[in-house]
Amino acid sequence: MSEPKYKRILLKLSGEALAQGEQGFGVDPTRVHEIAAEIAEVHRLGVDIGVVVGGGNFFRGVAEQAKDMDRVSADHMGMLATVMNSLAVQDALEKQNVQCRVMSAIEIFQVAEPFIRRRAMRHLEKGRVVIFAAGTGNPYFSTDTAASLRAAEIKADVIMKATKVDGIYDADPHKVADATMFAQITYMDVLKKGLRVMDATAISLCQENRLPIVVFNLNERGNIQRVVMGEAVGSLVSA
């Protein structure tokens, strides 16, 4: 079997990926176990894996539901949502016999380790999957930005952003039938065109640190491994 193209990855999952259906709420155990099985397959290839999970299946600080709330309080609720999701993914991975640690950007000692970069690096070197919870630990920063930050900190080779579409399009493919998908695009073009890949802060952080981003469809079974092996899956964002 050929060698993986990427030796260390940061996988970004949306909270909605763990839920059932389009507008799913909460965690669907079957879906979480399907995702964990795919991560476990990649882990068995000897790839170092960091994971960042969003919290949108429980609460989103910038969403309509939070419009009358203080933004900082809303973002803190979103961070706690990511902790719940991280624990769900950890449990599913452990059932796949994958050693796993949740590291939280906010102190929550009873359920997760605090994020300490050197300790995270040690876990990865020991072959453990590390799930980074609670975003950056600061309000006003998205979990996409947290993914970019953690990827830079652990010296990941790539950020793999799992979505419900095949890649990056010039328009919403669910609304525009003839939307065109980009096989490859630069950071600057993503920013100039206002493409909703990640927020501008996350994209800029990747650009500064020369971190490629692969946007791919998580609903296509086996895509995580295909991306890791370097197959032409999804859209690549690079310099």
UniProtKB/Swiss-Prot annotation:
Domain of life from the UniProt record: Bacteria
Pfam families in the record: AA_kinase (PF00696)
Reaction catalysed by this enzyme: UMP + ATP = UDP + ADP
Record bears the keyword Protease: no
Residues that span the membrane, as ranges: none
Binding-site residues for ATP, renumbered to this chain: K12, L13, S14, G15, G56, R60, T163, Y169, D172
Activity modulation notes: Allosterically activated by GTP. Inhibited by UTP.
Record keywords: Allosteric enzyme, ATP-binding, Cytoplasm, Kinase, Nucleotide-binding, Pyrimidine biosynthesis, Transferase
Pathway as given in its UniProt record: Pyrimidine metabolism; CTP biosynthesis via de novo pathway; UDP from UMP (UMPK route): step 1/1
Disulfide linkage: none
Assigned EC number: 2.7.4.22
Location of the region described as Involved in allosteric activation by GTP in the Swiss-Prot/TrEMBL record: 21-26
Any one cellular-component term (Gene Ontology): cytoplasm
Positions of UMP binding: G55, D75, T136, G137, N138, P139, Y140, F141, S142, T143
MF GO annotations: ATP binding; UMP kinase activity
Main location group: cytoplasm
Subcellular localization(s) per the UniProt record: Cytoplasm
Biological process terms in GO annotation: 'de novo' CTP biosynthetic process; UDP biosynthetic process
Function noted in UniProt: Catalyzes the reversible phosphorylation of UMP to UDP.
Subunit organization: Homohexamer.
Similarity comment: Belongs to the UMP kinase family.
Protein name: Uridylate kinase
Protein's organism: Koribacter versatilis (strain Ellin345)
Record gene name: pyrH
